């Protein structure tokens, strides 16, 4: 019984230990002053001037080492394992641990079931619950705070509270109620440029790139693939990422615009005195270096008899008296001897000079190089320098080439160190190897003291001198008369950032528990002795600001009462009044002390754990109202074409990876990735299979095929110079004759041989290979040709009345009967019959030849029309040819002696006669055969 009571008292006393108070065991009798110079073990502070336990630690009862941690709020049913860190029974760690619940919970009632309470013990409901009395006691019902909440976005009611959520593109502010715009650009969703907007963002690309169909990536623009009329380079174009590079063919060089090319001679032309302004000195005569002959330097003439140099050509050094000629330079060297009467002694006669150089009115051709004042290179001391280049010359001079002129001056030296060494041995600029200090040169790494400053130590490093003076430690004055760098300083002590005079006594830890003394520059501290206690260790109490433990007074019977709802908490009880960020403790005097924890948002999308004060960034992310774990990927709600990942409370989104297998993919609306079906050609959609022409190239025809675009030049129809007619009608006898239009035409003789019909491009529809012939029509045409060759020798027979109404032999799909579309009227008995119609033989061999008379023309008109169609019909395709074997065809042709049997042997289809087989008049028929 007593053991349980003592244990209960110990649980109450331990949480009352403060971080600023210390308890020490094993002290000597009161009145005994002990100066402990050093304390051994871990967690010891003030080592060297006395020692004590660091804040948050206390000496243990056995060894006296500082190994007993102190927890300010107590650990309840847990164990204090570090300063203000408790290890609870459920394995969690925190500033405190909940008390072990018995029949009643933390609030005096079991709130785990229906949020109820115990009427006899306490009547309390947590914040967010409404207390109601029932027949079985107190019941706590959840309050829907969303009915009157101040959420700017969407309110979600929870048990005991509510949570505010924001829509897409917005995030919750620090007040947990209002919404603010989410800067999506921080997650780098765009490849190049990103512009944030309220609830959204927009990607763009730099110059030389265009936005991909996914609206996030940037694709390089190939400037070199433009048509010839819009090409960017004069000669050759090389595409680069985001730009392009132009090059020129041999003999040309790029102009300043880096796009066009100009002619450039292979030989180096030296600037000449005659082509320079009056105010500029001459540098070199007009002399071109050739193979086997080097160029001359200014002020030097070629040696006598030197090979490769023409006689009389030399360099000059006197100023020029001739103005610049606004003409182009000659590209050939003038190798005429210089006469003695020449004012400069460098060039040939005026006639040769004028012919070679030109006059002011001479045009400047595109292949002529431009030199003189506008030249982009310089010739100096036998070398060529580009315009804008600088170089050093012997004698500490620096030269500059600018627009063909060389300007030399003194070398400008920029010192890169504080103490450079002056130049030696003909040098131009000082050196930073070594130091020049106080009139003396110091070697690299030399340590020295300046004159009259023995207490100052300097070092030379890379031309810089750094000096330091020794800092004299405090201490008593020395009796030695020898002078040194440090002066005599009275004894002082420096302790915890403050100086104390010799003999001063002060508190070491900011309280009265430690006493320190400054003696001869050293601090000695000792702890205040504590009396021995007669009460057991469990009843020790260390009050605020006290140095020694005292025995606990009898515990008062009352704790901390809350007047609003009648709840009473025992002394030392820690609870949260409803907000997990606020903790309250019941003090020993019955007062309640509450402290609120301020949370700092360390990530944009933390997770709020119920019952936990601050959001947690390590558990995952809360994004668009959903919770994601770390390293979890998910599609973006703002843009389905983005893939996002959660990383420690932060969300990073990037475009979905789209595999593209074609050159011109088209990105349909609402799709994340472009597809290789239609084409996106120069920003416009081209349907698959569509043929189109370029806007600036009407003669170029392109076609879109599954995301690829291929172009070709449209072939133009050649002029008709040698027409030909199909040979499937009947044999022609051709001869050349001029056409009325001045073209070379042909003449075709008809079947009787007495009429020549002129043939030109308009009368011949095209070569017979335009469409394949059908076997049946071709066979009938051959039969007609055979009968036509014997028609002149055939004797007339008595007219045979054709009473059969059976159709003639017809190919499949072609009706050989009367035309349906434009059938001519039947001729009357007295009307003349066309000679051609009267000479047509029967269609089948073995049938008697019957001359056509006016009486029989009406009955035989269908047969004649069919024969005429066979002579002029366009061959059909093989797909339209009737299915018939050669055996069936030969059997039909050899056993049938009438058109009725032929028509019965072959299939007959009622298809109409083609448009081109319709015969209007006999005259028109003869003109087309």
Curated annotation (Swiss-Prot):
GO terms for cellular component: cytoplasm; extracellular region. Keywords: Calcium, Disulfide bond, EGF-like domain, Glycoprotein, Repeat, Secreted, Signal. Residues 743-755 have a biased composition (Basic and acidic residues). PROSITE patterns: ASX_HYDROXYL (PS00010), EGF_1 (PS00022), EGF_2 (PS01186), EGF_3 (PS50026), EGF_CA (PS01187), VWFC_1 (PS01208), VWFC_2 (PS50184). Residues 291-317, 339-374, 731-774, 791-861, 879-929 are annotated as: Disordered. Residues 1-21 form the signal peptide. Its main location: secreted. Residues 70-98, 142-180, 181-219, 220-262 form the EGF-like domain. One of its GO terms (biological process) is cellular response to virus. GO terms for molecular function: calcium ion binding. Glycans are attached at residues 454, 464, 787. SMART domains: EGF (SM00181), EGF_CA (SM00179), VWC (SM00214), VWC_out (SM00215). Residues 791-807 have a biased composition (Polar residues). It is found in: Secreted. The keyword DNA damage does not apply. Residues 376-433, 433-494, 491-552, 558-618, 619-677, 677-762 form the VWFC domain. Disulfide bonds join 146-155, 151-164, 166-179, 185-194, 190-203, 205-218, 224-237, 233-246, 248-261. Residues 339-353, 889-903 have a biased composition (Low complexity). InterPro entries: cEGF, EGF-like_Ca-bd_dom, EGF-like_dom, EGF-type_Asp/Asn_hydroxyl_site, EGF_Ca-bd_CS, Growth_fac_rcpt_cys_sf, vWF_C/EGF_Fibrillin, VWF_dom. PANTHER family: VON WILLEBRAND FACTOR C AND EGF DOMAIN-CONTAINING PROTEIN. May be a regulatory element in the beta-catenin signaling pathway and a target for chemoprevention of hapatocellular carcinoma. This is von Willebrand factor C and EGF domain-containing protein. It comes from Mus musculus (Mouse). The gene is Vwce.
């Amino acid at each position: 019984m007593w053991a349980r009571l003592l244990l209960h008292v110990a649980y109450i006393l331990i949480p009352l230990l403060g971080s600023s108070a210390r308890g020490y065991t094993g002290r000597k009798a009161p009145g005994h002053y002990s100066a402990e110079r050093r304390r051994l073990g871990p967690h010891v502070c003030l080592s060297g001037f006395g020692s004590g336990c660091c804040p948050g630690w206390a000496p243990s009862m056995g060894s006296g080492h500082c190994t007993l941690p102190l927890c300010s709020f107590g650990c309840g049913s847990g164990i204090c394992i570090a300063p203000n860190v408790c290890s609870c029974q459920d394995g969690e760690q925190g500033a405190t641990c909940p008390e072990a619940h018995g029949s009643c919970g933390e609030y005096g009632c079991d709130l785990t079931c229906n949020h109820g309470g115990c009427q006899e013990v306490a009547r309390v409901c947590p914040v967010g619950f409404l207390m109601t009395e029932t027949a079985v006691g107190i019941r706590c019902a959840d309050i829907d705070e969303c009915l009157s909440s101040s959420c700017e976005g969407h309110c979600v009611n929870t048990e005991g509270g509510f949570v505010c959520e924001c829509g897409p593109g917005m995030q919750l502010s620090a007040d947990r109620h209002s919404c603010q715009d989410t800067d999506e650009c921080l997650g780098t969703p765009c490849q190049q440029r990103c512009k944030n907007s309220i609830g959204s963002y927009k990607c763009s690309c730099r110059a030389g790139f265009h936005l991909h169909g996914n609206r996030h990536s940037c694709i390089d623009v190939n400037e070199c693939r433009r048509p010839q009329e819009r090409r960017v380079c004069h000669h050759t174009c090389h595409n680069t990422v985001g730009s392009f590079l132009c090059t020129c063919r041999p003999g040309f060089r790029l102009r300043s615009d880096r796009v066009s090319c100009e002619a450039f001679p292979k030989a180096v032309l030296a600037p000449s005195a005659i082509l320079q302004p009056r105010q500029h000195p001459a540098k070199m005569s007009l002399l071109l270096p050739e193979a086997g002959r080097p160029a001359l330097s200014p002020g030097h003439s070629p040696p006598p008899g030197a090979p490769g140099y023409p006689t009389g050509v030399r360099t000059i050094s006197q100023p020029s008296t001739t103005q610049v000629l606004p003409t182009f330079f000659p590209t050939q060297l003038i190798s005429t001897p210089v006469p003695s009467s020449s004012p400069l002694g460098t060039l040939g006669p005026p006639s040769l000079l004028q012919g070679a150089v030109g006059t002011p009115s001479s045009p400047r051709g595109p292949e002529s190089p431009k030199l003189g004042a506008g030249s982009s290179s310089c010739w100096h001391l036998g070398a060529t320098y580009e315009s804008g280049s600088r170089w050093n010359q012997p004698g500490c001079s620096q030269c500059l080439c600018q627009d063909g002129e060389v300007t030399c001056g003194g070398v400008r030296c920029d010192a890169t160190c504080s103490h450079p060494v002056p130049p030696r041995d003909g040098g131009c600029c000082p050196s930073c190897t070594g130091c020049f200090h106080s009139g003396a040169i110091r070697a690299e790494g030399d340590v020295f003291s300046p004159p009259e400053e023995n207490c100052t130590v300097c070092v030379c490093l890379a031309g810089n001198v750094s000096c330091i003076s020794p800092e004299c430690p405090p201490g008593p004055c020395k009796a030695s008369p020898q002078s040194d760098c440090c002066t005599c300083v009275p004894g002082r002590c420096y302790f915890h950032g403050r100086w104390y005079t010799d003999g001063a006594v002060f508190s070491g830890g900011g309280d009265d528990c430690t006493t320190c003394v400054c003696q001869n520059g050293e601090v000695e501290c000792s702890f205040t002795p504590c009396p021995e206690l007669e009460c057991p260790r469990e009843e020790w109490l260390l009050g605020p600001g006290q140095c020694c433990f005292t025995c606990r007074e009898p515990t008062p019977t009352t704790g901390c009462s809350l007047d609003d709802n009648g709840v009473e908490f025992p002394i030392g009880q820690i609870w949260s009044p409803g907000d997990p960020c606020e903790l309250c403790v019941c003090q020993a005097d019955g007062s309640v002390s509450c402290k609120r924890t301020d949370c700092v948002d360390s990530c944009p999308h933390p997770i709020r754990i119920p019952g936990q004060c601050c959001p947690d960034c390590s558990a995952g992310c809360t994004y668009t109202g959903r919770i994601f774990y770390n390293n979890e990927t998910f599609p973006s709600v703002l843009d389905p074409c983005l893939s996002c990942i959660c990383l420690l409370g932060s969300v990073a989104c990037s475009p979905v990876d789209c595999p593209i297998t074609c050159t011109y993919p088209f990105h349909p609306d609402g799709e994340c990735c472009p597809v290789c079906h239609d084409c996106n050609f120069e920003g416009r959609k081209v349907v698959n299979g569509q043929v189109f022409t370029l806007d600036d190239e009407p003669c170029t025809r392109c076609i879109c095929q599954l995301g690829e675009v291929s172009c070709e030049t449209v072939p133009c129809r050649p002029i008709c110079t040698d027409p030909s007619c199909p040979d499937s009608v009947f044999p022609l006898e051709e001869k050349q004759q001029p056409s009325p239009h001045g073209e070379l035409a042909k003449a075709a003789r008809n079947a009787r041989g007495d009429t020549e019909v002129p043939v030109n491009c308009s009368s011949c529809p095209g070569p017979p290979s335009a469409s394949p012939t059908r076997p049946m029509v071709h066979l009938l045409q051959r039969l007609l040709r055979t009968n036509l060759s014997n028609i002149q020798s055939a004797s007339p027979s008595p007219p045979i009345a054709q009473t059969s109404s059976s159709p003639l032999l017809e190919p499949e799909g072609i009706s050989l009967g009367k035309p349906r579309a434009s059938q001519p009227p039947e001729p009357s008995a007295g009307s003349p019959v066309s000679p051609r119609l009267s000479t047509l033989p029967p269609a089948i061999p073995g049938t008697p030849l019957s001359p056509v008379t006016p009486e029989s023309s009406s009955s035989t008109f269908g047969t004649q029309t069919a024969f005429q169609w066979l002579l002029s019909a366009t061959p059909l395709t093989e797909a339209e040819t009737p299915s018939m074997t050669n055996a069936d065809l030969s059997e039909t042709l050899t056993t049938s002696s009438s058109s009725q049997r032929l028509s019965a042997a072959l299939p007959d289809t009622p298809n109409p006669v083609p448009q081109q087989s319709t015969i209007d008049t006999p005259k028109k028929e003869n003109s087309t055969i």
